[in-house]
Amino acid sequence: MSLTEARFHDLVDSTQQALEDIFDDSGLDVDLENSAGVLTVKFESGQQLIFSRQEPLRQLWLAARSGGVHFDYDEESGKWQCDKSEELLSEMLARLVSEYTGADLDFDEI
């Protein structure tokens, strides 16, 4: 069953809020900006992670230095999963943040 528009927006909103909370609590020197449904995380190194919603496809998109990645929400697991590699958003973020900062953050709650 595909996500309804309302459910999709609720999921993206709660995911973005959880991400903000994780970064706020991390002690990392990051700037967070959430505007018009787009969350931008700017690291001290100049690297950025940009999270946006693609409503027609019901996907969460992540733009990073390595390129763009599209995530579908898997209702069974309750996780965002890459539509190409099937890597979980939580796993990809842990890897990218480690590459950018050397920090080991836990994104399992998303």
Curated annotation (Swiss-Prot):
GO molecular function (one): ferric iron binding
Keywords: Iron, Metal-binding
GO terms, biological process: iron-sulfur cluster assembly
A Pfam short name: Frataxin_Cyay
InterPro entries xrefs: CyaY, Frataxin/CyaY, Frataxin/CyaY_sf, Frataxin_CS
SMART domains linked to this entry: Frataxin_Cyay
GO CC field: cytosol
Family: Belongs to the frataxin family.
UniProt cross-references to NCBIfam families, sorted A to Z: FeS_CyaY
Official protein name in the record: Iron-sulfur cluster assembly protein CyaY
Source organism per UniProt: Pseudomonas fluorescens (strain SBW25)
Taxonomic placement: Bacteria, Pseudomonadati, Pseudomonadota, Gammaproteobacteria, Pseudomonadales
Gene name for this UniProt entry: cyaY
